[in-house]
């Protein structure tokens, strides 16, 4: 799935749309975003050595994970990202890097879906 189709499922738009493409791999949703280097969140973080902030990496993962729910998203429901546990950043992400996240549904409890 490419960006234009992703836009039909997610409410985010540039500059906050942080998924370039998505594909299903079995029960996993695999999403990707290529860091171009001109993103607003790199301005000042850090001059001369730009690094994607951790909170932006979390947002990338949240948006990608929301695409797992694409069959439930009908334009009327906006998925809400309510938390993450045990998040660790093992490597810095720089311009030119491709961020890839894999997600699967772990549990459904009423209106809450744990991914």
Regions found by a protein language model. Give the residues of each.
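Hydrophobic core residues within well-ordered beta-strands of beta-rich domains
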Residues: 16-18, 99, 113
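Compact, glycine-rich, soluble single-domain proteins
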Residues: 43-53, 57-66, 81
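Hydrophobic beta-strand-centered segment that forms part of the acyl-chain substrate-binding groove
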Residues: 64-106
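Residue-level signal for pocket-adjacent positions within structured domains
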Residues: 1-5, 11, 36-37, 41, ...
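Catalytic strand-loop segment that frames the active site of acyl-thioester-processing enzymes
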Residues: 13-52
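Short Pro/Gly-enriched beta-strand edge/turn motifs at strand-loop
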Residues: 1-6, 97-101
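A residue-level signal for conserved active-site and pocket-lining positions in enzyme catalytic cores
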Residues: 22, 61, 103
